[in-house]
């Protein structure tokens, strides 16, 4: 693979989601999956702030066919949740989908019914850039999870075999486990911690938000063209948050290569990002806090982080402490290696698929 092709490949992976970053030196060719588009409209959706929207549109993709057991309940539905700034299509990344969705794979679409939503504020779902700008309701992860559950109700899905969430979706998976106990057979949160976002994590998010708000061109969110400097500075911070040190050093071993790669990546990121949308989805984590009620998560949990995750650094020791509070949870810390990709390891399914295979066998419902 040429260096130019390598850079294009990694840029595409990085841009699959702002924090949902998957860096790679090589990847299988993308497959064309028979994804079916769907949309539900939730009327008079009320947010945790008390704000409401007359109509909240939620877009999603599905793969496979739903199946119902003898009691009439869905028994093969899998909910896959994307990261901050991503969308349903980001989980069609070949590093993820080629490993998991094909014939005989762990989430073979001939066996499972995969549901990939665009979260509030993302993709083709309702978001600030649709027109409300900073008057859009200030959604948070609780709102997102509640809307996901309402979407499933509209789809007539009354049970899930698995919820697998990456990054933001990882945090939402913990919220699911507390809020809708028993709705899923198994929970797989990848690349997060079940505690409030504070310390360096919140500082970096706050810096990204303030970079935009402090740009005079932002105009309180009523800009007619993107606030370029503020948006650029925000994307710089987000890039560093999701990067992995080993792969960045391999990719850009000289000063010239490092600067060119960063310039190329940011030019693409800036062209694809709306400033108001970024403010909202980065700030959606502000109220996240499953910590007080972790003991209520009795569903089996497979929780995986990687040692080179800059957003969730293992030296904090939080995961090892918190996993003990969930009665059926297992935490795995994947050591840094040539295979890991920083925070984006959550999308590189080859790294953790064997753990998921064991977990799926262990949680297979008994007849």
Where are the model-predicted features located?
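Catalytic-loop region of hydrolases
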Residues: 23-77, 88-89, 367
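N-terminal cap/lid subdomain of alpha/beta-hydrolase-fold enzymes
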Residues: 61-130, 318
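Conserved acidic catalytic loop of the alpha/beta-hydrolase fold
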Residues: 142-162
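Conserved hydrolase catalytic core segment
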Residues: 159-201
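Alpha/beta-hydrolase-fold enzymes
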Residues: 183-268
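Short beta-strand/loop motif that positions the catalytic acidic residue
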Residues: 297, 303-305
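Conserved alpha/beta-hydrolase "acid-adjacent" motif
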Residues: 310-317
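Catalytic active-site module of serine/aspartate enzymes centered on a nucleophile-bearing elbow/loop
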Residues: 328-367
